Amino acid sequence: DLLDGYTNETGFPLTAAHQLAYNRMIADLAHERGLAVGLKNDLEQIPQLVGDFDFAVNEQCAEYDECAALSPFIKAHKAVFHVEYDVPERTFCPIAKRLRLDSMRKRLDLGGWRSPC
């Protein structure tokens, strides 16, 4: 479900350029079918991909101090859906509200419990 495979050890050569092409293909295929499509966690390529995707999904940007990287989506008037698992709401919600992220805390078991900002 992540669109940043090039940042991981894959066992075969996968470059940032390959990832850009793949991500754009996914966005094009979704749009051809009348679907909205979200970019999940590929923070490094957001500047190149914000025009191709309709929204962003992020896990743990507050924990890793990366939430500001999602700002191009907000500036383009596109939603950012964000979840934290270990960081308390009192820590990440002020950041999320300042950046205008739609944020919540979830448990890792991903049951029904949630605590939105």
Language model regions located:
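Glycan-processing catalytic domains of CAZymes
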Residues: 1-117
